[in-house]
């Protein structure tokens, strides 16, 4: 979609409203607001404001505005949209940003501290991370058990405390296409982690 085009924003909002908001969903999770394009080169993106390599970074700003304008038109003033990306100024649209699908490593945790500080310095107050990382993390590993405890400790000081991820150690006992992930909460890693 091209959220820089006002007509596109109106069209997409109408679909979102009809399929979600009118059915009681009033907090939306907009993933892939970077935008996610393949191959991953902004020069492959053409927007109404110009070529992607010139204006592509503004994409998440208008992506957030899409929901905000629609909710405002409905008379809402308590608007929050969870988004994987933002642009300076998107905070006025109630954008709650998380850092995306990140690995479950101590290096990634270190980078989240920097990312959170950078977001705050950009004036975007609602920022969070996938506590424990999004992908990886062997639930049987002592290193991962330590990591998730430390990440929970960091998460307490983030503006939004959010746990989300896909862990190794999937439940393959049921005959389903996508098995359930392994434990993803501190309490699932034994008394030591829970006590901390």
Regions found by a protein language model. Give the residues of each.
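Catalytic-domain carbohydrate-binding cleft regions of carbohydrate-active enzymes
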Residues: 1-196
């Amino acid at each position: 979609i091209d959220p820089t085009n006002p007509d596109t924003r109106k069209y997409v909002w109408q679909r979102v409203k009809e399929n979600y908001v009118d059915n009681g969903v009033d907090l939306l999770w907009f993933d892939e607001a970077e935008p996610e394009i393949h191959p991953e080169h902004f020069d492959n993106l053409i927007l109404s404001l110009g070529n992607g390599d010139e204006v592509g970074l503004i994409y998440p700003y208008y992506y957030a505005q899409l929901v905000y304008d629609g909710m405002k038109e409905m008379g809402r003033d308590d608007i929050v949209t969870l988004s994987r990306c933002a642009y300076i100024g998107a905070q006025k649209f109630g954008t709650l940003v998380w850092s995306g699908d990140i690995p479950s490593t101590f290096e990634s945790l270190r980078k989240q501290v920097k990312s959170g500080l950078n977001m705050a310095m950009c004036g975007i107050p609602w920022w969070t991370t996938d506590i424990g990382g999004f992908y990886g993390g062997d639930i049987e590993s002592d290193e991962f058990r330590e990591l998730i405890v430390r990440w929970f400790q960091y998460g307490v000081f983030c503006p939004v405390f959010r746990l989300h991820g896909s862990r190794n150690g999937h439940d393959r006992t049921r005959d389903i296409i996508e098995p359930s992930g392994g434990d993803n909460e501190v309490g699932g890693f034994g008394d030591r982690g829970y006590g901390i």
